[in-house]
Amino acid sequence: MPNGKNGNGLTLLERFIPDGLSNAATTLVDSLKINSISEKVRRRRRVVIKRRNIYGEQLADLANLYFRISSIPIRFWSKVDDWRRWEAGCFKMLNGDRFRVFASGKRTVCEEKLPGKSLWDHMNRGTLTRQMLEAAAHEIRRAHQFWNDEFDGPWSHGDAGMTNVIYNQRTGRARLIDFEIIHDKSLPATVRHADDLLVFLLDIVGIVPGQQWLPFALRFLNAYGNLDVIAELKNQLALPNGMAWIWWGVRTSFANPAKVKKRLEKLRDLTANLRRYRTVAVKRARQRRRASISCQEMSPGMPRASSRTLAISDKAKAASPGMPRRLPTKR
């Protein structure tokens, strides 16, 4: 097939891949179920049971070969024991304050089910909000601050898409799940962290409607807040070539490549000028809620003599200038 470029700067291969290979690639991804997932109730608490399939190790090795050939910096945990250790350890590190995780059998990890729904579900139902995106960004930033011996540095997820972010509407808290994938351990922490942001943002790029996607991306990046990582993200916002493009197709739900390319360009501009965007947003917020110059900090209780409340009270009690101070008395 010729590999020239059209007017939009897209190769002919990239134009035909969504139409010719999207269904096949989607089927392949769906069939690539390294682990099976089920739910049960144990001791009156619902648990998620993740079990490594019989051919899971071979499938993981096959996927890792594709990642390596395509220069995609992630891999599956192919060995069952390694996966169980990593899955349980990450879940406990991030969610062990409220929820338990335990091994059950040689190929199984059991995790208490987190309350809420994934941001992926909210996005597809049209119920995704900016508050949810802020909660996700705060949780990812929190997770990135944990030290991990496997990396000999800060931890990263490796697959931080919206399907793996659970949001609890009652508490307003987001939590991360699903730790089957790990980043290449040779990568610097900022590169790994930027890749986590990229994976999350590609869901927004591929699915969210035109008028919402950029404000959503801005809200997420502002809430994440680490400008060094966001600067590194700018270097990763370009459509890849060759076989790596198929994985990006999966990440963006095989959205139109021209649309993805245009949105990535806007994201690059956003990341390059995020500091300016944040300054403008802060100024607007200050203009909307200017503090009164007559308000003073005070402790609860009796108002001070100089306070505005007491001054108003005294003024209300004062006699009018035209009113005599005493009523006339009869003699």
Feature map (PLM): residue ranges:
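Juxta-kinase regulatory segment immediately upstream of eukaryotic protein kinase catalytic domains
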Residues: 2-29
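ATP-binding glycine-rich loop module of kinase domains
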Residues: 35-82
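Structural motif at the C-terminus of the N-lobe alphaC helix and the adjacent alphaC-beta4 loop
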Residues: 82, 89-98
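Conserved structural core of kinase catalytic domains
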Residues: 98-136
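Catalytic-loop of the protein kinase fold
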Residues: 150-162
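Conserved protein kinase catalytic/activation segment
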Residues: 164-176
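C-lobe/activation-segment region of protein kinase-like
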Residues: 179-277
